[in-house]
Amino acid sequence: MRTLSLLVLFSLLTAFVRANPVEDSVKAKTPFKDFSLAQVEKGDVLVNREGLSQTPMVEAIQTCFLIKASVGTVTSTLVNWNPAGKSGLDVTSHQVLDSSVSADSFQSKLGPFLSGSKGGGWIAKQSHDAKDSSCELMLNDGEKSLLAATKTPDALLHAWGTILAKRYASFRGKGAADFSSLLSAVRQIGPLEVSSPSGGTYYWELSDLDGRGSISEGVTWQDGSRVCDGEFFVTSEYTASFDVSTLWPVTVDGKSATLVWRIDSALSPQFADLKGAERIASGSLVLSSVKKAIEAIRQKAEK
């Protein structure tokens, strides 16, 4: 009987030692049901695209990966993330926005972009053709009319500054309606305050996507153990994005590290028209972009 009791005790102790609360949490909260820390210790990124979006216009991807830096360092990196100039990324300028902005707030960076870059030149041409059906800029009718009416570079610059200032003020005042669609893709995370992020860092960016320019505005904020990033205005490729990273502290080789479960989602009317192979190809492009961002964030945090 005593031998049996010792065996039972040994089994319980062994189970306790082997139990990993972070691994259990990942298995319970994410689609990575067979997860173990060993799967990501060497830098691999786990990917899952199933069961996220209930909206045809939303493309969403989940990833799980390790960053060999403390949770505090990773949180700071994500909240203050500046992708401009990072290898493999398309962002050429990232600027933090004050609580109050005007059309003039954007001109120092926007002017050289529109007149001196390939992507900016594409934006300028699309702006002049904004009332034409061929225009690919994702703007409302009023914004298109404002751009199409411009006759000089200075007028175009001011028009874009006006659009950005109004979009920013609108989000700060009312929130972005597009975020409600994107929430379907992150419903597994839990309740999130997205209409008016508390303590958020607002920013705007200029990007050059192989000669196709993009102008965007967004906000990054911390929500407990999660870091959220949402673009509420994007001119090209998609209309809004919403990303959430959940962070767990772990120890790897005796050093502090961070396990990240990340959901990336983007909204575009174009996604609804994609079927079969086209939809798969679209998802592959999104995944490629996400992996490049993950690698850049990892390199920054691990420095």
Residue ranges and their predicted role:
Residues 5-15:
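Bacterial N-terminal signal peptides
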Residues 20-303:
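Eukaryotic helix-grip
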